[in-house]
């Protein structure tokens, strides 16, 4: 369903990542499957988290090249929008770009900057991430 939605909307790096991940169409991928691809391409891993996590934990994970993944799945009534991230959002929405070396390094650097930031600055960094990475800010030639 979502593959049709992203046609003509997603950048090539994201589409390349979708292909590299080889996400199954008939089941939820296992985190070990995602880790094998991410580690081979950029040295990243996914880290199981309960759902929303504190900013400190978020930046710690990114700084250690681990992307937080909540392992619950949304209900059929929540297919179009869910307020907190589920495994589909994390794997389909974020992991494809983490196969791209440039984006993976950007995310790693963002995590390190977040750890150096004050508590107040972390709020702004988290908002910037939310409004760009979460909602998808992209410009290509």
Q: What residue spans do the PLM features occupy?
A:
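The feature captures two recurrent sequence modes
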Residues: 1-94
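A contiguous, surface-oriented mixed alpha/beta subdomain in the mid-to-C-terminal portion of proteins
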Residues: 72, 76-141
């Amino acid at each position: 369903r979502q593959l049709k939605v992203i046609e003509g909307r997603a950048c090539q790096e994201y589409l390349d990542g979708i292909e590299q991940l080889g996400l199954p169409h008939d089941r939820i991928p296992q985190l070990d499957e995602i880790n094998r691809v991410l580690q081979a391409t950029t040295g990243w891993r996914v880290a199981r988290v309960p759902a929303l996590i504190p900013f400190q934990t978020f930046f710690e994970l990114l700084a250690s090249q681990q992307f937080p993944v909540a392992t619950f799945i949304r209900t059929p009534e929540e297919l179009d929008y869910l307020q907190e991230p589920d495994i589909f959002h994390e794997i389909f929405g974020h992991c494809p770009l983490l196969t791209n070396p440039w984006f993976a390094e950007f995310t790693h650097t963002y995590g390190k900057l977040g750890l150096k930031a004050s508590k107040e600055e972390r709020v702004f960094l988290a908002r910037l991430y939310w409004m760009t990475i979460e909602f998808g800010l992209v410009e290509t030639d």
